[in-house]
Swiss-Prot record:
This is NADH-quinone oxidoreductase subunit D. InterPro entries: NADH_Q_OxRdtase_suD, NADH_UbQ_OxRdtase_49kDa_CS, NDH1_su_D/H, NiFe-Hase_large. HAMAP family: NDH1_NuoD. NDH-1 is composed of 14 different subunits. Subunits NuoB, C, D, E, F, and G constitute the peripheral sector of the complex. NDH-1 shuttles electrons from NADH, via FMN and iron-sulfur (Fe-S) centers, to quinones in the respiratory chain. The immediate electron acceptor for the enzyme in this species is believed to be ubiquinone. Couples the redox reaction to proton translocation (for every two electrons transferred, four hydrogen ions are translocated across the cytoplasmic membrane), and thus conserves the redox energy in a proton gradient.
């Protein structure tokens, strides 16, 4: 009897793989079709964001946040703006808060639509992405009408938002809500009961709640395993405490539960958007949309044409920028992918001394090895799809 040396088979998944969602490289160790080890290689989209922010004024740092999770840009700006406002100790008027929340929920729908439909595409369903992108296109137009840009908005700034929303735009967002729910029903009918979709996702990538906390998960990943942890509820910011919405939680902690939670969250986001639209058209129809602290928010164009002081002030704010009191602060928002946090250290100058970005996708990608071990090779793509990973924020 001869002895055979059996060694496992190594393959590279990515960086140009269509299911890799960007520039991920996974080194997979396979025993036949069973995955023995998953080794994610990241850093292929590293741009040194945290270091670059240290060389810019507080206002100039805002656009860097759009480029992290680039499928829901305003949610990141929101966390940064909250951190700077905490250090400055300024309050945002209610109209500004409502606009921020409205656009944060639009970002959540943008992200979940992309994720749910591409997760379906990863397991072979080709129709949902076409339907999802049709709705995303309409939302991108709302982004553009608010900020002038479809993706990199730089709209949520420390002190409020950049410009007020026209009344017509608010009405159009309100009109978009109900037809969208019908489109969501179509995707729901196609996927939720689909036998093939369920076979590829049920009991795949199961994570228990204890493991979730141990791996540092947040957002949908934790809620899929049964914890009702949502920063909009547990640590309310802006005007979330005044709004009505439900937090869906799963019980199995598998890919399918996470898919269902994202579907329900989109409906809850529409519910929040409707409440914001109603208030923006009634009690918060007029009034300031950004802080009235003139030391942070630049003066209006009309004022600059009348007053020399306003012109000087505007020039100073855009060249030197405002000085933020020394201190350190952590602000987090419930981004579509999980808890997006900004840890900001100020030394009292006009530039951040250090800005640490806590990206949710980074913690989730760490657990790829833990979640895929023992599964089939084909399940790696399904697990990766349900983690909802965008490389801008993982590599920063």
């Amino acid at each position: 009897m001869t002895e055979h040396n059996v060694r496992n088979f190594n393959i590279n998944f990515g960086p140009q793989h269509p299911a890799a969602h960007g520039v991920l490289r996974l080194v997979l160790e396979l025993d036949g079709e069973i995955v023995e080890r998953v080794d994610p290689h990241i850093g292929l989209l590293h741009r040194g964001t945290e270091k670059l922010i240290e060389t810019k004024t507080y206002l100039q740092a805002v656009p860097y946040f759009d480029r992290l999770d680039y499928v829901a840009p305003m949610n990141q700006e929101h966390a940064y703006a909250l951190a700077v406002e905490k250090l400055l100790g300024i309050e945002i008027p209610i109209r500004g808060q409502l606009i921020r929340v409205l656009y944060s929920e639009i970002g959540r729908i943008l992200s979940h639509l992309l994720n749910v439909t591409t997760q379906a595409m990863d397991v072979g369903a080709l129709t949902p992405p076409l339907w999802g992108f049709e709705e995303r296109e309409k939302l991108m137009v709302f982004y553009e009408r608010a900020s002038g840009s479809r993706m990199h908005a730089a709209y949520v700034r420390p002190g409020g938002v950049h410009q007020d929303l026209p009344e017509q735009l608010v009405q159009d967002i309100g009109d978009w809500c109900d037809p969208f729910l019908k489109a969501l029903d179509d995707i729901d009918n196609l996927l939720t009961g689909n036998r093939i979709f369920k076979q590829r996702n049920v009991d795949i990538g199961v994570v228990s709640l204890e493991d979730c906390w141990a791996w540092g998960f947040s957002g949908v990943m934790v809620r899929g395993s049964g914890a009702a942890w949502d920063l909009r509820r547990s640590q309310p910011y802006e005007c979330y405490s005044d709004l009505e919405f439900d937090i869906p939680i799963g019980k199995n902690g598998d890919n399918y539960d996470r898919y269902l939670i994202r579907m329900i969250e989109m409906r809850q986001s529409v519910r929040i958007m409707k409440q914001c639209v109603n208030r923006l058209l009634s009690d918060a129809k007029t009034g300031p949309f950004s802080s009235i602290d003139g030391k942070v928010v630049p003066p209006k164009r009309g004022e600059m044409k009348r007053s020399m002081e306003a012109l000087i002030h505007h020039f100073k704010l855009y060249t030197e920028g405002y000085h933020v009191p020394a201190g350190e602060v952590y602000a987090a928002v419930e981004a579509p992918k999980g808890e997006f946090g900004v840890y900001l250290v100020s030394d009292g100058s006009n530039k951040p001394y250090r800005c640490k970005i806590r990206a949710p996708g980074y913690a989730h990608l760490q657990a790829m090895d833990f979640m895929c071990r023992g599964h089939q090779l084909a399940d790696v793509a399904a697990v990766l799809g349900s983690l909802d990973i965008v490389f801008g924020e993982v590599d920063r």
